[in-house]
Amino acid sequence: MNVINGKKIAQNLQASIKLKVDTLDRKPGLAVILVGDDDASEVYIRNKEDACKEVGFYLEIINRFDNISQEELLFEIERLNHDDKIDGILVQLPLPKHLDVNLVIETISPKKDVDGFHSENIGKLMQNKPFLHPCTPKGVMLMLESIEIDLVGKNCVVVGASNIVGRPMACELLNAKATVTICNSKTKNLSCKLIQADIVVVAVGIPKMIQSDWIKPGAIVIDVGINRLDNGCLVGDVDFESVRKVAGWIAPVPGGVGPMTIATLLKNTLTAYEARI
């Protein structure tokens, strides 16, 4: 078993981004909107703030109370759409229930949609003509690239069908000419599908759901899940200790996909910057 060190891969990617930024006349600009005071969201934003400082980006963090109206939030996004200092816009999810998440995402200019969630960017990904990739799936692809795996013809199973990870993950793998099966936590005989997979990507939000007897010996297992247990420990959707004894490669939680998501966000911001100059 080999561990895919997402933290190290992300550091290398961020170092290459910094080298590029050092040659630019203007720093790429990222705006992050945080609505409310969700503790987990604040941690994620601090991580993004640290990463932006590391690569030399301009960062604007906009904090709004959780009672902000839909109209006020959309007005803020439109302001950023027209701000020449800002190349990328990110609205930290989740949002309070009274806000329409889809409308918020669609209001962000697709040219500044560095999360890669706008329908225009998802459509380009489906056509295999991507511009700004959804960050987590692209981060997974970069992890697979780092171990020099040839995806052509590989049997891949994606467990989880969210718009943020599962669906775009399947598109990324299809674009790499892999054979892809999409499942979810309710899929019948899930273990039978997984045992045939060369590559497994899991994002369902169920702690330690995937067990070692579901995994083909030598398979590559990418755990996207982040779950905090009652004792405060962070674990993934894969039972790491048992699966590591079977898998050929495995991405751990923490230290796997998480750092790659942030690094890919920075990569998207640089791409958006370059498209505007």
Swiss-Prot record:
Q: Name one GO biological process term.
A: L-histidine biosynthetic process
* Oligomeric form and interacting partners: Homodimer.
Domain of life the protein comes from = Bacteria
Family the UniProt entry places it in = Belongs to the tetrahydrofolate dehydrogenase/cyclohydrolase family.
Which region is the signal sequence? Answer: none
* PANTHER family in alphabetical order: C-1-TETRAHYDROFOLATE SYNTHASE, CYTOPLASMIC, C-1-TETRAHYDROFOLATE SYNTHASE, CYTOPLASMIC-RELATED
Write down the EC number: 1.5.1.5, 3.5.4.9
Spell out the Pfam families in the cross-references. THF_DHG_CYH, THF_DHG_CYH_C
Its biological purpose: Catalyzes the oxidation of 5,10-methylenetetrahydrofolate to 5,10-methenyltetrahydrofolate and then the hydrolysis of 5,10-methenyltetrahydrofolate to 10-formyltetrahydrofolate.
Q: Which SUPFAM superfamilies match?
A: Aminoacid dehydrogenase-like, N-terminal domain, NAD(P)-binding Rossmann-fold domains
Look up the record and name the pathway of this protein.
One-carbon metabolism; tetrahydrofolate interconversion
Q: Which UniProt keywords apply?
A: Amino-acid biosynthesis, Histidine biosynthesis, Hydrolase, Methionine biosynthesis, Multifunctional enzyme, NADP, One-carbon metabolism, Oxidoreductase, Purine biosynthesis
Gene3D superfamilies in alphabetical order: Leucine Dehydrogenase, chain A, domain 1, NAD(P)-binding Rossmann-like Domain
Q: HAMAP family annotated for this entry?
A: THF_DHG_CYH
Provide the residue positions that the database annotates as binding NADP(+).
160-162, 185, 226
Its GO CC terms are: cytosol
What name has this protein been given in UniProt?
Answer: Bifunctional protein FolD
Q: Which GO terms describe its molecular function?
A: methenyltetrahydrofolate cyclohydrolase activity; methylenetetrahydrofolate dehydrogenase (NADP+) activity
Q: Which organism is it from?
A: Vesicomyosocius okutanii subsp. Calyptogena okutanii (strain HA)
Q: Which reaction does it catalyse?
A: (6R)-5,10-methylene-5,6,7,8-tetrahydrofolate + NADP(+) = (6R)-5,10-methenyltetrahydrofolate + NADPH; (6R)-5,10-methenyltetrahydrofolate + H2O = (6R)-10-formyltetrahydrofolate + H(+)
